[in-house]
């Protein structure tokens, strides 16, 4: 099959879009997994786009590199989509309502409708905001729990393992998250395996953070989802949200002075390379009520369209 594609990234979280009307029925997953491979288009997630089936503007089916299966949410995908809708033929292809100074798109996902808002100036998307409310609900539905992984405190947020790098270093002082040598990777893989064992989980969703920002953020974050295969995302929208929920539940956002009467605002340093040093900034706004997170919106400082092309599978 011969497929058109659009490739972009959010802080080096690489997204590939395909068009559902070009894929033979029953081969959607096959096509989505294949284009992610390094010898093909190469990326972290694929979004297969379709016309809406409910009240949204378009629908997406998302496939992850490590899961090799359909997943419910991908924040990076929504950020790239917001930019692509404004700046490429994708917007016209789906007859999306592109307006200045603000374009709002409702994306139908398996987690629910996701509002995406692009700040538009001169035909360019200067900033994109994603409402991650459906993913917040999913996290609480799947459950939160505090864990101890071989002596290292951690928290489970939905599918995610959320881990404080400093707490890892208390037990493994040799760990170096700024260069991520093989020895450090083995430590993280061991902790992730223990997380899966304790939670009876097959998910690879993993957030590693610390409170040592080097630029203008509040903390640093990295997403080493599957170090065994090299699947490390310097930025991850669902990871930003899961980390924020975990830090709210642990009380760390309050202790760091990042909360107010409505919730919290967090700035993550991230992006660039697969290490815990990122020159870019992701902003997360949490809405909280009754002691728990009820909503989340986020935006990343660097979203780029890499290329449009055609691939033969």
Where are these regions (language model features)?
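C-terminal binding/interaction regions
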Residues: 123, 127-151
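N-terminal, positively charged, Ser/Thr/Ala/Gly-biased leader segments
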Residues: 1-12, 143-157
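A glycine-rich beta-to-alpha transition motif near the start of alpha/beta enzyme domains, typified by
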Residues: 1-124, 162-313
């Amino acid at each position: 099959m011969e497929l058109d594609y659009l490739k972009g990234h959010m802080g080096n979280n690489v997204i590939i879009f395909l068009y559902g009307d070009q894929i033979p029925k029953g081969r959607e997953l096959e096509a989505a997994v294949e284009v992610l491979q390094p010898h093909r288009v190469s990326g972290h997630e694929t979004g297969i786009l379709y016309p809406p089936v409910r009240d949204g503007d378009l629908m997406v089916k998302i496939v992850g590199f490590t899961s090799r299966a359909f997943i419910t949410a991908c924040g990076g995908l929504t950020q790239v989509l917001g930019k692509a809708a404004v700046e490429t033929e994708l917007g016209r292809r789906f007859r999306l309502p592109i307006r200045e100074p603000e374009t709002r798109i409702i994306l139908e996902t398996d987690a629910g409708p996701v509002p995406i808002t692009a700040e538009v100036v001169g035909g360019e998307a200067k900033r994109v905001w994603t409402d991650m409310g459906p993913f917040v609900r999913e996290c609480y539905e799947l459950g939160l729990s505090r864990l101890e992984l071989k002596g290292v405190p951690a928290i489970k947020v939905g599918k995610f393992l959320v881990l404080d790098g400093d707490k890892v270093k208390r037990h493994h002082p040799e760990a170096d998250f700024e260069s991520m040598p093989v020895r450090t990777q083995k430590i993280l893989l061991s902790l992730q395996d223990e997380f899966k064992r304790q939670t009876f989980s097959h998910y690879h969703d993993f957030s590693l953070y610390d409170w040592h920002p080097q630029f203008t953020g509040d903390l640093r974050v990295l997403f080493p989802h599957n170090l065994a295969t090299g699947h490390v995302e310097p930025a991850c929208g669902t990871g930003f949200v899961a980390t924020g929920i975990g830090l709210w539940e642990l009380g760390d956002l309050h202790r760091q002075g990042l909360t107010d009467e409505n919730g919290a605002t967090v700035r993550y340093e991230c992006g660039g390379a697969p290490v815990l040093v990122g020159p870019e900034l992701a902003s997360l706004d949490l809405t909280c009520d009754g002691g728990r997170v009820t909503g989340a919106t986020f935006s990343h400082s660097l979203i780029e369209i890499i290329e449009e092309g055609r691939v033969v599978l």
